[in-house]
Amino acid sequence: MNYRVRRLWVVVASSVVPLLAGAAAVPAPAGTNLFGFTAAESGNQRELEQRFDADLNASDLRGWLKTLSSEPNQVGSPHDKANAEAVRDLFQQWGWDAQIETFEVLYPTPKQVGLELLGPTKFVATLKEPPVEGDESSTRTAGGLPPYNAYGADGDVTGDLVYLNYGMPDDYKDLARRGIDVKGKIVIARYGAGWRGLKPKLAQEHGAIGCIIYSDPRDDGYGAGDVYPKGGFRPAQGVQRGSVQDMTLYSGDPLTPGVGATRKAKRLPISQAKTVLKIPVLPISYADAQPLLAALEGPVAPPNWRGALPITYHVGPGPAKVHLTVSSDWGLKTLYDVIAKIPGAQNPDEWVVRGNHRDGWVFGAWDPLSGHVAMMAEAKAIGVLLKSGWKPRRTLVYASWDGEEPGLLGSTEWAETHAEELQHKAVLYLNSDTNSRGFLEAGGSHSLQHLVNDATGAVKDPETGVSTIARLRARMLVRGFDKSASAEARHDAQLAAAGGDVPIDALGSGSDFTPFLQHLGITSLDLAYGGEDDQAGVYHSNYDTFEHYVRFGDPTFAYGVAEAETVGHVVLRMADADVLPLQFTDFAATIAEYVEELRKLTDDKRKSSEELGKLLDENAFSLATDPIRPVLPPEREPAVPYLNFAPLENVVTRLKASAKAYDALHAKLEAGDVKLTPAQIKELNGLLQGMEQALTTARGLPPNRDWYKHLIYAPGALTGYGVKTIPGVRESIESNQWDVANEYIGITAAALSAYCTRLDRATKLLSQGG
């Protein structure tokens, strides 16, 4: 779904060389333990992983990608169902118990869309993506859907046009300072700077009657690089499709929040579905946007609002008047989730769950099939191990999700259907999505941070041959050396110099980890390669094709193999370690940073409010504005009280001590100095399996986001995909809800205290084996 906005953590890459299929691991020094394994176990595990690597083959990935992306495969299409059946059959052939699980979901598809400029000149938008020379796939659009935004309302509206920049909250403040109101208007915003669904949601809340979203060439067209087919970036008539379902409230089927969308499920009327918008929304190309924007007058747009079209950007309103019409079929469609299992030989009730979605907006070669074929390679290699006599300690569950693009439908409905079982059995959910040349990007639960470092530190970059961690540290040091480096880059450079674990990112939303991590509290991880590619230009368009991917994504499929190898090592270690390989010192340090960020956020907000108040009292804004083109002063900000962060600061001190004690005894377990009975191991793993759920709250998050339960990681109410850490406190501070902030300081501190208590129980159990 979202190709790269939620991740900060990166590791590997450079230029293109041919891929040699097979193992690409960097041999660890002899006698070095793998995290979670004794010396003897480490040798066996390395040998297992080498056998796994030897069965990863780039030609497999290429062949699967070409087949799966050969026709449009959106939800409800014949090719989507055919792909599900083909994937199921392959899993069965490889020795997995694979079945298709179906759900019935609300999935609107367009019947009629139209956009025309009525005056001062006339123009009718084409709303089509023509074939591109040299891209045979782009000609095979029969059965595909035209560009549209799913879950925008039906409507036939006419009104003056207003340009909104990116259509985010600060843009409305800038409009207000220019005396412009969007009530009763149709707004046009460019993609970027935040999740697409927030643009029409905010427009709706501000009284707009329709919303148009376009891709400006400055962001992913000729302003970023050569356009397709010369380069990889968005051509003039390329359109980014996408869902505008309000997933800041909940993901999944809009009609069945919190329960699986089975045939017999009780459904809301569409009019009561909170995630379905109330105004029509339509995405367009920059070729179609240019005549609309050129017809605007009113104030000239501020410098940071100006794109790369050869026009003067004006804000409006008018004199441009537009007519927008959207009509959809609002019926139910069937989802086809492929669920494949290998039962655990010793711990069958502990599940390692692995998933990647399969559906696309059109062909979906990049998003999601590049990641999906890597997952298939893992499954095939695991099948070879299985047929050789190996069996995993824990149960493996591999999932090919349907319906991710419209709103994480397949994963959410499956997770909600099996919620109780997952909360008792799942020890990990490991997600992937788009994959391509570049850097390893990892995000997730910070108790997994050390495992990620340990597993990826033994993997070669396919193109440079150096270890991922060594190359990452070099990158971090170089970025921090830049005199204009951000505070984050300088902080990363300090971490690189210190030589400890490289941090993984916190997860917001945008892919199928969301229902597992943020709704159910399952320890989760998201892994991919990317960053040295031109995917942005064809994201969610007719040009996300096999031809584009093999030119600009991963020509040799080296990074597909690297993805399979990296993810496979994590899966195998989680499956086979006697004691779940979690480490808590990194988690404690991360929480300490988040709490310090909250204090700084409050202090900075207070200082800003005071400085703004002083400038307003001195009439500084009115004196500084251009009298010919006046800009109104900003609104006065409320006073910022002093919050009591002591409950969080005190629990952080306890958390650091608890984490240090557990990790020290776990290290002794690896060294063979701690011996546990099978019964003690089972009890210990039971405690560890539920650690992440201790960080959730049954009441959910404010404001009115009860589906989101996680108190440490959540997508922001005003960022969409972007993460907010300690969200109940952070977002309450940002929205000046001081009583709610104080309340969630207490709620979050209590959850972290319960987390410490559970961890202390695990430590006590380990100590009994000394």
Question: Language-model segments: which ranges?
Answer:
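Second-shell loop/turn segments in exported
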Residues: 47-55, 69-78, 147-152, 186-193, ...
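Alpha-helical metal-binding/catalytic segments enriched in His/Glu/Asp
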Residues: 338, 354-408, 413, 567-570
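Metal-dependent peptidase/peptidase-like ectodomains
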Residues: 122-124, 234-300, 347, 403-550, ...
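Soluble metallo-hydrolase cores and metallopeptidase-like ectodomains found primarily
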Residues: 139-174, 249-366, 380, 384-388
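A conserved hydrophobic secondary-structure block that centers on an alpha-helix together
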Residues: 160-233, 345-349, 361, 366, ...
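Sec/Tat-exported extracytoplasmic proteins
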Residues: 56, 60, 65, 69-79, ...
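C-terminal amphipathic alpha-helical interaction region
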Residues: 673-770
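Noncatalytic luminal/extracellular "stalk/propeptide" segments of secretory-pathway proteins
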Residues: 26, 30-47, 54, 66-186, ...
